[in-house]
């Protein structure tokens, strides 16, 4: 029997025993060694050769991943590991580390119960480390820590036992500070922090395949002195044989990560807001393989032979070929064509996948990342809220008009596979817009369209995504319908930062129970009366109905919301989305005859009123910003900080870390386009840097008019602003 077939059979045998299952993700900052570590785990499980582990990068299956040397797509694999006499099934997802592909990390966290956070011993916790820890904790996923590249402390930095211990404890302290800061409201904070003593921290070198933890040192009798001696003597093979990395890490996974039976009762209330007393809730809590089928789709991929593959977590029931299942948000049922598990880049079909496992399913043609799939209609899972959002846009056109239909179909597929990509299709002009997390994100997607689909495309220069926001409160504005028979009286106020943050994080929505929504809004600072009158949440804005007993308003309210939505999707400055507005409807006068208060009357009246109220509330343009961190030798520190400041940026901190200086600051995304080549040139290639999207800020008044005019011209709008705009 082939090795691969044997492993698949072992996995199938363990699938029915959720106590022996561990669903985990490996997550880290870019280049901290996740995929090299995953190679070691695959070799330890007998899935690839130990000789090639670390160089094979078996989970980076796409050509561009191998070329660039980074993980772009999250990749799944199932493996087995024996721990304390019991076989365990480990379903592992290797996630990207580059900030532009953070959406894959967010989606992976919904499918797993444990996150193995990898940190470079030399660099320490970095911006994306903080992001992945935050993503894990928001999803109720327990972290453990692997500190990688310890060999560099010994061989490159020549650190002794005391210096090493100090540095490693500093890394652990930084990670625990992140965990504590994000779990303040949990009662079991100590259960979430990691420590050497309890075995939730391991150290080692993924490149040289050795690792240690407190339990492994107690078992083998090795200490850090022995490790330093063997590493300095270049006896790395002996070190690997005495304390192999895969055993140390997989033992930690089996011992400290929860199995689905322990995890699901705790996680279900976090990710699902349905009736907690229902049969389906009980079935998910119990991980009941005989219950109703419930699958949460976390990823969509395309196989050239099998078509679309939906990957996700089976929370209840058993998935089988031929089942007819509902997909949330769509009509009718989809028929399951096949079910399987992942073996790195390949999918292995199996007869069934029971609750508690991660499955690969074909036939769910209507599913997208975030879909709830079930054999009975049910309350869907909470949407997967991505921490970052699109900040860069490019136009994309087919070079040959014959390819236009295929390009449109491909773009729609791209946005289905990657929800952090936003697509705007204009079938009239043939020019389409693709928006993503950064330059690399868009570059990878456009190259894949050309390479995988064979469509030559032309892309425009990167364009930054802007927003509009009120900066004060407006006077009451009257909106009048074209027939003069309907009037609406509206004001606009600023939403507080805390309320806006709750909306951005998905903590408050119209999908949640009304009482719960009120409580969240009041905790964020909204007064009780206002929280009780929330009529709708439109994007990142809140609509309050302050009216009392207006005749015919109930049957007209849907049109009022449509008008508000129109006005907020295209703000009055540059037709950019509006955020941070609280719109109040104070009064209305409606014609008694429904034919005179239809869409053509109500929508323009409310849209116009909101736009004029926004202008009166001193609406301004918001620009996206990025946190910037540059690690550079001290002689180039001035050049590095100059690169940030010369881009309308601000340097917030400069400090020494090891033999390098660290420059930390903030800069507008628009000015950071082309930063890579400029920072290399300014520092003679000696700098390493990281950027992370940090939301939006109000653009300086002296730049507002110029940028607004550029946007309006690009969109084919009039290049003069309404006369009433006088606040900048």
Swiss-Prot record:
Location(s) in or outside the cell: Cytoplasm
Residues bearing PTM Diphthamide: 596
Record-annotated disulphide pairs: none
Source species, domain of life: Archaea
Keywords: Cytoplasm, Elongation factor, GTP-binding, Nucleotide-binding, Protein biosynthesis
Gene Ontology biological-process entries: translational elongation
TM helices/strands, residue ranges: none
GTP-binding found in the keyword field: yes
A cellular component annotation (GO) from this entry: cytosol
PROSITE patterns: G_TR_1, G_TR_2
Main location: cytoplasm
Keyword Nucleotide-binding attributed: yes
Gene Ontology molecular functions: GTP binding; GTPase activity; translation elongation factor activity
Matching InterPro entries: EFG_II, EFG_III/V, EFG_V-like, EFTu-like_2, G_TR_CS, P-loop_NTPase, Ribosomal_Su5_D2-typ_SF, Ribsml_uS5_D2-typ_fold_subgr
Domain tr-type G: 19-261
UniProt function note: Catalyzes the GTP-dependent ribosomal translocation step during translation elongation. During this step, the ribosome changes from the pre-translocational (PRE) to the post-translocational (POST) state as the newly formed A-site-bound peptidyl-tRNA and P-site-bound deacylated tRNA move to the P and E sites, respectively. Catalyzes the coordinated movement of the two tRNA molecules, the mRNA and conformational changes in the ribosome.
NCBIfam families, alphabetized: aEF-2, small_GTP
Recorded family membership: Belongs to the TRAFAC class translation factor GTPase superfamily. Classic translation factor GTPase family. EF-G/EF-2 subfamily.
Protein name: Elongation factor 2
Lineage of the species this protein comes from: Archaea, Methanobacteriati, Methanobacteriota, Stenosarchaea group, Halobacteria
Gene: fusA
């Amino acid at each position: 029997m082939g090795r691969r077939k044997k492993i698949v059979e072992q996995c199938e045998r363990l699938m029915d025993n959720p106590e022996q299952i561990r669903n985990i993700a490996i997550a880290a900052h870019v280049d901290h060694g996740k995929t090299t570590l995953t190679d070691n785990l695959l070799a330890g499980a007998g899935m690839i050769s130990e000789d090639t582990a670390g160089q094979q990068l078996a989970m980076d299956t796409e050509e561009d991943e191998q070329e660039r040397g980074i993980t772009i797509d999250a990749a799944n694999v199932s493996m087995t590991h024996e721990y304390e006499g019991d076989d365990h099934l480990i379903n592992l997802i290797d996630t990207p580390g580059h900030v532009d592909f953070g959406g894959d990390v967010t989606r992976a966290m919904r499918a797993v119960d444990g996150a193995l956070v990898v940190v470079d011993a030399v660099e320490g916790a970095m911006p994306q480390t903080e992001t992945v820890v935050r993503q894990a904790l928001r999803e109720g996923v327990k972290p453990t820590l692997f500190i990688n590249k310890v060999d560099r402390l010994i061989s490159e930095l020549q650190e002794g036992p005391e210096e090493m211990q100090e540095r490693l404890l500093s890394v652990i302290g930084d990670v625990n500070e992140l965990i504590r800061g994000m779990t303040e409201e949990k009662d079991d904070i100590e259960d979430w922090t990691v420590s050497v003593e309890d075995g939730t921290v391991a150290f080692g070198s993924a490149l040289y395949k050795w690792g240690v933890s407190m339990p492994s040192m107690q078992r083998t009798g090795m200490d850090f002195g022995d490790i330093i001696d063997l590493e300095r003597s270049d006896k790395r093979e002996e070190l690997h044989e005495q304390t192999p990395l895969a055993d140390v890490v997989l033992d930690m996974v089996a011992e400290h990560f929860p199995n689905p039976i322990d995890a699901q009762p705790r996680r279900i209330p976090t990710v699902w807001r349905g009736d907690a007393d229902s049969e389906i809730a009980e079935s998910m809590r119990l991980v009941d393989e005989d219950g109703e089928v419930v699958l949460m789709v976390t990823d969509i991929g395309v196989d050239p032979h099998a078509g679309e593959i939906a990957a996700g977590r089976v929370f209840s029931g058993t998935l089988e070929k031929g089942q007819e299942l509902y997909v949330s948000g769509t009509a009718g049922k989809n028929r399951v064509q096949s079910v399987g598990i992942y073996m790195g880049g390949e999918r292995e079909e199996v007869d069934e996948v029971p609750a508690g496992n991660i499955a690969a399913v074909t036939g769910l043609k209507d599913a997208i990342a975030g879909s709830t799939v079930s054999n009975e209609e049910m309350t869907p899972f909470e949407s997967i809220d991505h921490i970052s959002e699109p900040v860069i846009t490019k136009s994309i056109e087919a070079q040959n008009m014959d390819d236009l239909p295929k390009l449109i179909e491909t773009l729609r597929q791209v946005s289905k596979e990657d929800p952090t990509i936003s697509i705007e299709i204009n079938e009239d002009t043939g020019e389409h817009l693709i928006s993503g997390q950064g330059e690399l994100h868009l570059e990878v997607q456009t190259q894949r369209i050309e390479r995988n689909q064979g469509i030559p495309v032309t892309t425009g220069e990167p364009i930054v995504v802007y927003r509009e926001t009120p900066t004060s409160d407006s006077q009451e504005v009257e909106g009048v319908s074209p027939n003069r028979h309907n009037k609406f009286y509206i004001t606009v106020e600023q939403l507080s930062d805390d309320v806006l943050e709750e909306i951005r994080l998905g903590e408050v929505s119209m999908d949640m129970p009304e009482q719960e929504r009120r409580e969240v809004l009041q905790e964020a600072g909204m007064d009780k009366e206002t929280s009780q009158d929330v009529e709708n949440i439109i994007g990142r804005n809140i609509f309050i109905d302050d009216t009392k007993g207006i005749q015919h308003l109930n049957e007209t309210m849907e049109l009022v919301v449509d008008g508000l939505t129109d006005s907020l999707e295209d703000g009055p400055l540059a037709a950019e989305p509006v955020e941070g507005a609280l719109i109040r409807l104070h009064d209305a006068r409606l014609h008694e005859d429904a034919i005179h208060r239809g869409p053509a009357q109500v929508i323009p009246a409310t849209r116009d009123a909101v736009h004029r109220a926004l202008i009166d509330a001193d609406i301004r343009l918001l620009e996206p910003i990025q946190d910037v961190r540059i690690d550079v030798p001290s002689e180039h520190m001035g050049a590095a900080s100059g690169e940030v400041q010369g881009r309308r940026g601000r340097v917030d901190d400069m400090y020494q870390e090891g033999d390098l200086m660290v420059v930390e600051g903030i800069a507008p995304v628009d000015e950071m386009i082309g930063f890579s080549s400029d920072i290399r040139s300014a520092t003679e290639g000696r700098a390493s840097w990281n950027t992370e999207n940090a939301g939006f800020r109000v653009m300086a008044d002296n730049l507002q008019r110029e940028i607004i005019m550029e946007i309006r011209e690009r969109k084919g709008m009039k290049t003069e602003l309404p006369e009433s705009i006088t606040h900048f």
